[in-house]
Design a protein with these regions (language model features):
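Acidic/polar-rich alpha-helix caps and helix-coil junctions
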Residues: 1-25, 34-37, 48-276
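C-terminal, active-site-flanking charged/polar segments
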Residues: 38, 43
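Nucleotide-sugar donor phosphate/pyrophosphate-binding loop at the beta->alpha transition
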Residues: 31
Length: 276
């Protein structure tokens, strides 16, 4: 459907009975609503372009965090300095505009990031019509591959077919293949748990922001309580002196991104989500 061979099951767009709407976002200047905000944890889950987690990367830079990364990061996450709908996104120009230095008002991002996946750049979010005219994808081929890889690794640790299945997903986006033969490379998986954790991360980045799939993953893996009890973090920033560019209300300071401390948002209690 929609001309994509990867789609296995979808809810087809059929106006006026079945429609889908543009996922809005909010930045300065205003263009929509920012109700879905990727967390820092999700942003950090995307590997560097050599296949290393950023915590072990030799090419990752905190001051330029979107450079040399898994290309799916840019597909999923809108960030400061990008252009969308004819405007340049500025997520944190003023401290005085919000308690975290991020939000411009109630509809703005709370984390410093916006959702990019599902945005349709051909639609003006300020126009009268918000319908995307797109089918809603329920199952696509990557889900079949990762389901197989996960299950095969559990019953037959480090099986070649498990590697092949997960690597089909990675090859599609130009990411280095996971492997078990060369310990000098960041893609090396020495144990069943090594491959297990890489497959789990592949689920997260491949299906990021896709209709709540993440909640079923963390339930299946038995880690929901840990994940949902952890604090939500947003982008790193600090306030610096800048008498020329600062708003008087900000005491002569402007916000510089990717330095200082992460924005810490309200936490989430596992029990609030009624998960068992």
């Amino acid at each position: 459907t929609d001309g994509c061979e990867e789609i296995i099951l979808a809810v087809q767009y059929n106006a006026p009975d079945k429609t889908n709407y543009l996922i809005g976002w909010e930045c300065f200047p205003t263009k929509g609503w920012g109700g879905l905000n990727p967390t820092q944890s999700l942003v950090d889950a995307f590997e560097d372009s050599e296949g290393a987690p950023i915590s072990k990367s030799k090419i990752y830079s905190e001051k330029n965090p979107f450079a040399n990364r898994d290309p799916r990061l840019e597909v999923n996450v809108l960030h400061d300095g990008e252009e969308m709908y004819g405007v340049t996104i500025k997520v944190a120009p003023l401290k005085s505009s919000g308690s975290t230095g991020i939000a411009q008002h109630g509809d703005a991002t709370a984390t410093g990031y916006y959702q990019q996946k599902w945005l349709d750049p051909s639609i003006d979010p300020q126009s009268a019509g918000w319908e995307m005219g797109k089918d809603w994808v329920t199952i696509r081929y990557a889900e079949v591959l990762l389901t197989y890889a996960e299950a095969k690794n559990e019953v037959s640790p480090l099986d070649d077919s498990a590697f092949e299945a997960v690597n089909q997903v990675r090859r599609r986006v130009g990411m280095p293949e996971l492997q078990k033969t060369d310990a000098t490379k960041p893609t090396y998986c020495a144990t069943q748990d090594d491959l297990r954790q890489r497959i789990r991360n592949e689920w997260r980045v491949e299906f990021a922001l896709e209709g709540g799939k993440r909640q079923w993953d963390i339930r299946r893996w038995g880690i929901a309580k840990d994940v949902l009890n952890a604090p939500f973090l947003g982008i790193k920033y600090k306030m610096v002196d800048d008498a020329v560019n600062a708003d008087p209300k900000d005491g002569g300071k402007v916000c510089v991104l990717y330095e200082g401390d992460n924005v810490k948002l309200a936490g989430s209690r596992y029990e609030d989500h009624n998960l068992s």
